[in-house]
């Protein structure tokens, strides 16, 4: 299928409000993006690669450097994924690539391996070569750290031939300038950090040969449109570009027009794509019953394995954490307020199995950061590609409740630097997640798809459980009410419709409420203790603790890695009122079927009851016979009643 790029100049520029429109204007002005190395306008050829069955390709047939193959063996990469088997050969041929594949399909290795291969070939021809030839752009710091770790693993046997720098690390500008002065081969960064270093001349892109924009559909949505605008002017012509995304949206199409030359478009659709292998359930419940059901699920161990709980904002994170703490249920909090080192460490420890429950605030989705991009899509909906997006067109009216509030989230987005580079529902590689619990239902079906994509990865089974508040139950319990729950039913209808198009079913799940109601009074006691003041104090206390762990102890832990194991993030934050009795479940509350599973019959002897007289008193009586408790000999015992002399007045 052939399409010739035709710049659109007939738009009314006054109507351009979203990042996609502003960048489309740049695409018209900055036509050098569409010229090849000989300054000749290139015709944009889109070759669609639809792959439903995995090839028999192996890493040996990809002709990679032996050092890279050795690293793959060490990391137990036995067979390339569909996106790797298609993208790597094309990348080694020097073609621009736009790949759509779900998160967890191996997109990172699909662009890291060919870039490393090219660097090693250049170093073999000229060992003294020092130049920054690769730039990898990601929307969040967490994803930057993840990509950097992949580069380190794959270049483990390359010695000093490959050097990479992560610009999102929290170091001083002087340290960052020193790292860049040595001309690292690869740079991983957010767009904002690249522009900042270009402005100070600490970074030079003159020798750049590879540009990667990972999670391309999120880069503009996270507020980097101005940075991308400036970056498009700074990148030289002829750079090989990789656009990797889980969805093909209008933002991706805009980036393609800015940076790509005749890209090959890969639409990978394997049999496990988009939620296959994930059992999806929905529970209709009142607002306070969300807490009740969460308590029952974890206290009765109804879900085995690691769980990610998605909530609407940071306050909900701490409200739920403090609530679960009172029942002895430990959990971690993950949000944009925490230092980046703490967030990365939480994810790493969760993947190692140190923690079982993470409560994550999906702030980017709730703050409405994608509303402007959705509006811009309506203006550029003429492109056929923008319509073929995993149901992205359905999301345009997914959020009616936010249309009147769009100005406030936009303002908050611009002033919130922490939230700008934080994202948890996309890109982060959570491993072996058994269940995703949507405590607060997302406001779009697109966000729902990304959330449940945290489980059921690499062909494993997973479960997604979502709480939905019916319209007639919204606002009935003010302390636990959340604004977005008002439209849960309309959002659920769109989610069900979209999942049905993908061939998946969202099934209703019914709890036996007669048995669950027995725990309601305990839930009520726990919720009373979680006051607004307790939440504010918990947030402040957590930030203080994590800042100490993140900054002052970072160097110490680098020198003493064994002590890092004691750095935990699931400690108690302490509610306003401690109620120890809530941590234990009386036998009369236990369901008859579940009583045996969590009973103490098979527990060894624990000496709670006295088995005899007081031990100290018994020892004292015994010692008296040995003389230890007797007074020295020669001292006569005196009876005070017989020797008492009142005396005369």
From Swiss-Prot:
Region Disordered: start-end pairs: 39-60, 370-420, 612-649
One Pfam family from the record: DEAD
Sequence motif Q motif, location on chain: 57-85
Protein name per Swiss-Prot or TrEMBL: ATP-dependent RNA helicase dbp9
Gene: dbp9
Domain notes: The Q motif is unique to and characteristic of the DEAD box family of RNA helicases and controls ATP binding and hydrolysis.
Subcellular localization: Nucleus, Nucleolus
Database matches in CDD domains: DEADc_DDX56, SF2_C_DEAD
GO molecular function, one term: RNA binding
Reactions that this protein is recorded to catalyse: ATP + H2O = ADP + phosphate + H(+)
GO cellular component: nucleolus
